[in-house]
Amino acid sequence: MVEINDIIKLYTVHPNLDLIDKNFAEDCEFEAFNIPSFKVKGIEAIHEIFKAIGFYAKDIKISKYNYTHSSHCIVLNTQQEITFNILPFVKFNYRMIINIHKNKENKITKFEEITDLESVIQNIPLANYGYFNIIKPALGYLMVKAGSYNRGFQNNGPNKIQATMERLSDNFVEKKEVNYSEPLIKLSKNFNGVTHQDKIDNMDEELFNSKKIDIKDGSNNAWKKPLNLHQ
């Protein structure tokens, strides 16, 4: 497993080359997007790259870092300090991003160094002021103006699905109580406006009245008055 501390320890004027043998694959690629940029392949060539640090640098170290990782990749964001042999009294600070690609055996198959050029410019006083206060704002202004001159761009408006859902939401009315018999009652109305429910109520009333006993002759009214079933 690749340890972050092993990578940090390589950035010194006296690197431990055993850490390279431990973490790097034999056919690993090393690519630097620096000034100058270069690319090598093979673990022996990578040995020489880290041995060369002591040739051009009096001192180098990673002062701050953070990283993200997955099963196949590590992205190491570092802040480094370096003192060159030709300028032993001047310390340069710069940012370097290191991309580490691993295989299934947790060996490094590709190692990339990407130096942030803006962090290098910050170490040069006059260039620092001119770049961050004149050149960079001017380029931002030109990009904004270029966008305003693009007449061919058309805004497609809101998303069609979103607009449809909003219309449905506006037209939706929640009905709290549902009377399931209401449609049936409406359909069963005849031309006189009488429903089957009304007929049933009338039949119940006649049946109730028919069960009353005539006090005079003791007979049941149900035999004297037939029920009207056709109203």
UniProtKB/Swiss-Prot annotation:
Protein name: SrfA-induced gene F protein
Organism: Dictyostelium discoideum
Top-rank taxon: Eukaryota
Induction: Induced by srfA, during development. Down-regulated in grlA null-cells at 16 hours of starvation.
GO BP term (any one): hyperosmotic response
InterPro entries found in the cross-reference section: NTF2-like_dom_sf
Gene name, Swiss-Prot/TrEMBL: sigF
